[in-house]
UniProtKB/Swiss-Prot annotation:
GO terms for molecular function: aryl-alcohol dehydrogenase (NADP+) activity. Belongs to the aldo/keto reductase family. Aldo/keto reductase 2 subfamily. GO terms for biological process: aldehyde metabolic process. This is Probable aryl-alcohol dehydrogenase AAD4.
Amino acid sequence: MGSMNKEQAFELLDAFYEAGGNCIDTANSYQNEESEIWIGEWMKSRKLRDQIVIATKFTGDYKKYEVGGGKSANYCGNHKHSLHVSVRDSLRKLQTDWIDILYVHWWDYMSSIEEVMDSLHILVQQGKVLYLGVSDTPAWVVSAANYYATSHGKTPFSIYQGKWNVLNRDFERDIIPMARHFGMALAPWDVMGGGRFQSKKAMEERKKNGEGLRTVSGTSKQTDKEVKISEALAKVAEEHGTESVTAIAIAYVRSKAKNVFPLVGGRKIEHLKQNIEALSIKLTPEQIEYLESIIPFDVGFPTNFIGDDPAVTKKASLLTAMSAQISFD
């Protein structure tokens, strides 16, 4: 997304709040800890802590830049020590007494589900954390963790964060059904394809100005698939009377499931306004079907064999339909 100085960051946060925004997502390691520090300074200077929902994360190595690679085992991972020091430091940087949502940033496979959920629950009991989230973790791990938590009077995960967009739909295979089962909200990242979803007009403008794509992986060209999906997004955008491809990309994930809160970022207030525009756009079933036809997605076995949940599809699976006539209306 490019760099910003503190003044520019505060201006963007001010515009976000004035537009009605109140939830900010960050992590212990973002920008070598500066993200949490700046957010904390902004909230304090504006006296807005009570109005803001802060979501941050632990697991990532947030001290590598300071202590050096290979020397920061206690500052990363899902284990108790990592959790303890990370939350301690996040509270200090954010200049707050509590974290609204604390995420496990990613599953490291080195700490047991029981240890992680027990340790997280203690933070909730202490009032340091209000709700728990989990990010970039297999659905089976989250399911086992939530079953353990609810079976033992612990706090379960209430929101899942992961990669999902109209071009990359693996999220729909197991994550969405899992979240539906546990009543979890969804916070997808990479909704706009890491900045690669750009209309032909926007790309020509960039070329004219000597700019490439400014993405998380550097400046580069669109792939053939990204060009195709961008053209499709532009077509749907035109049907909604807008030129914003990103607004349609955001509207797509919001139209696919309940309780979807896309994570979006940007450096300019005009980008923020385009993102907000997506909140008023509701895609039709035909538009969703069209977008998904551009780059077909195979949900894989067993769903492509037994079908999805009839409560969602409103129709019986192939095997059930062979045996009985059932209405799901």
